[in-house]
């Protein structure tokens, strides 16, 4: 699976805790992330992470484009709901694309743990078959 990992500044440490905890599962998948988040994850875990640009510099949009092309299977995005983000429209657009293309999206630790454990159980096999270039009708 192709999994995108994104975290706002105040949530990066939480995301790293999650990735360390589930590294034994995530190492079997291709990990993608926005710039700083990806670098921090790679440094903290040793896992290979393909880094897009930083979120405010277009990284969220790059991940969104990958979603639209059917190249992402899951998004874990630890958002900071208490801090205004200058690129909030990009964040909203990414979340919208996840809804349009039925891509699992989690924005917090609890939901992310459920998604990652579901990967381990093979619960997303049918999802791979449903991806295509056209949004559902």
UniProtKB/Swiss-Prot annotation:
PANTHER family: METHYLGLYOXAL SYNTHASE. CDD domains: MGS. InterPro entries: Methylgl_synth, Methylglyoxal_synth_AS, MGS-like_dom, MGS-like_dom_sf. GO terms for biological process: methylglyoxal biosynthetic process. One of its GO terms (cellular component) is cytosol. GO terms for molecular function: methylglyoxal synthase activity. Its EC number is 4.2.3.3. It comes from the Bacteria. Belongs to the methylglyoxal synthase family. Substrate binds at residues 8, 12, 34-37, 54-55, 87. This is Methylglyoxal synthase. Catalyzes the formation of methylglyoxal from dihydroxyacetone phosphate. It comes from Exiguobacterium sp. (strain ATCC BAA-1283 / AT1b). Gene3D superfamilies: Methylglyoxal synthase-like domain. HAMAP family: Methylglyoxal_synth. The keyword Lipid biosynthesis does not apply. Keywords: Lyase. Coiled coil: none annotated. It catalyses: dihydroxyacetone phosphate = methylglyoxal + phosphate. Residues 1-137 form the MGS-like domain. The active site is at 60 (proton donor/acceptor). The lineage of its organism: Bacteria, Bacillati, Bacillota, Bacilli, Bacillales.
